[in-house]
From Swiss-Prot:
Record membrane topology: Multi-pass membrane protein
Keywords from the named record: Cell inner membrane, Cell membrane, Electron transport, Membrane, Translocase, Transmembrane, Transmembrane helix, Transport
Subunit structure: The complex is composed of six subunits: RnfA, RnfB, RnfC, RnfD, RnfE and RnfG.
Name this polypeptide is given: Ion-translocating oxidoreductase complex subunit E
Segments crossing the lipid bilayer: 22-42, 69-89, 93-113, 128-148, 182-202
């Protein structure tokens, strides 16, 4: 498997920052009350990761090892400030919804961790790819969790998408279920923890199933039997 493919698979699934490393849980749990908020913060985080990884990789030869972390944080803070101004200018409703969690991307362990683990040691293309993969992996978890909570809590999905993507995105708003009494627990912090726990359990089950299939396939190939069968009687 090529290095680029390894980074993609790792960021999106095997080393997913939200479901495997459990990093950045504060914004993940707080902002995912709706799919729109989750998508907005996820895209902002992905943009920050891609830009900061590229900038840090580009300047890694001129950064003294003794002060690299403060310099990384300054680069991250500069990129986050630009992203914050862009959201404020073009998606003000989303900017108000996300609030303090946009500038808090600066302190997100995911961003600093990838800067130290990958960007400071890899080429610019690989660093940018890693940032994009990690960001999209986190975004996918945010959107799935936000969608689950929004459907259970309000019966809708992508309500207010026009605040993020423009007037055309009003068509993305879908009334999935009509509730006489919405389940507010899903929109509150306990609902976020329960939803995340369900996603963690689902990933664990899928990974176990994939390992079992891989083991069975390897045993079948070793014994010269058709795939899915073993020599056991």
């Amino acid at each position: 498997m090529s290095e680029a493919k390894t980074l993609l698979v790792g960021g999106l699934w095997k080393n997913n920052s939200a479901l495997v490393q459990l990093l950045g849980l504060c914004p993940l749990l707080a902002v995912t009350s709706t799919a729109t908020n989750a998508l907005g913060l996820g895209l902002a985080t992905t943009l920050v990761l891609t830009c900061t990884n590229s900038a840090i990789s580009l300047s890694r030869r001129w950064v003294p090892a003794e002060i690299r972390i403060p310099i990384y944080v300054m680069i991250i803070a500069a990129v986050v400030s630009c992203v914050q101004m862009l959201i404020n200018a073009y998606a003000y409703g989303l900017y108000q919804s996300l609030g303090i969690f946009i500038p808090l991307i600066v302190t997100n362990c995911i961003v600093v961790g990838r800067a130290e683990a990958v960007a400071s040691k890899s080429s610019v293309p690989l660093s940018a790819l890693d940032g994009m993969a990690i960001g999209l992996g986190a975004t996918s978890v945010m959107v799935v969790l936000g969608s689950i909570r929004e459907i259970i809590g309000n019966g809708t999905i992508f309500n207010g998408a026009d605040q993020l993507l423009g007037p055309w995105a009003k068509a993305m708003h879908i009334q999935v279920v009509h509730f006489d009494s919405p389940m507010l627990l899903a929109m509150l912090p306990p609902g976020a923890f329960i939803g995340l726990g369900m996603l963690l359990a689902a990933k664990y089950l899928i990974d176990n199933k994939m390992k079992q299939r891989a083991t069975l396939k390897a045993e079948s190939q070793a014994q010269g039997l058709p795939e899915g069968k073993t020599g056991a009687l």
